[in-house]
Amino acid sequence: LLDEIEARNDFVLLLADPEPTPWTRRVSRHCDELLLLADAQAEPAIHPIEENCLLRRAPLAEAAEILVLLHPEGTQCPRGTQQWLDRRPVADHVHVRPALDRDMARLARIQSRTAVGLVLAGGGARGFAHLGIYRALQEEGV
């Protein structure tokens, strides 16, 4: 059934159980990418699901593991990220404030491969022009 659903859709989101269960193990074996959601204010200890379903996965499981650190709405500058990354072999990580629509939209763009990156170079007066470009892009929701 999962193969049929995947054949008909570009993206399929499977939600694992909050505890290690047969469904959670199946999800961890079947997916192309795993989003590990974690409260950034919690201790960065390995969760039982990570221990049972991810760290013990078969070597052929090629799913990229992405750590999504969830922050309170008022967080300006995330801290303690390295403690999370030191404990788990993830392919990437992203910081998200779930209360902010723009953060959730950014996560959706990243996952759907439609994210936009911005690279600016130069200094002096160009730096002020860069700020203007950045603000204009933000105002347009890019």
Please report, for each region that a protein language model flagged, where it lies by residue:
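Patatin-like phospholipase
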Residues: 1-11, 19-142
